[in-house]
Amino acid sequence: MKFLVDVRITDREAAKPYLPAHLEYLNRHFENGDFILFGAYVHGEGGMLIVQSESIDSLNLLLQADPLKKGNCATWETLEFRVARAGTNLAD
């Protein structure tokens, strides 16, 4: 299953100490294949992920480990979707 995860930082100052660990978390799950794509919003108030997960329950367990979640300084909205087409230039 594929999920779009919209992450919104609710308190920028409170989030600052968690950002290095959050980036490490993102990279670790990208390297192991859980996260297909991730990036920050240009305005700096969060970002989004495309995640491969077996179920919404396993996705929620994965998201609970995010340092921003542990710091209670961000919110998450998750939406399941089906890929219809994908370009090769996503990183441009």
What positions do the PLM features span?
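Conserved, structured core segments of small domains
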Residues: 1-92
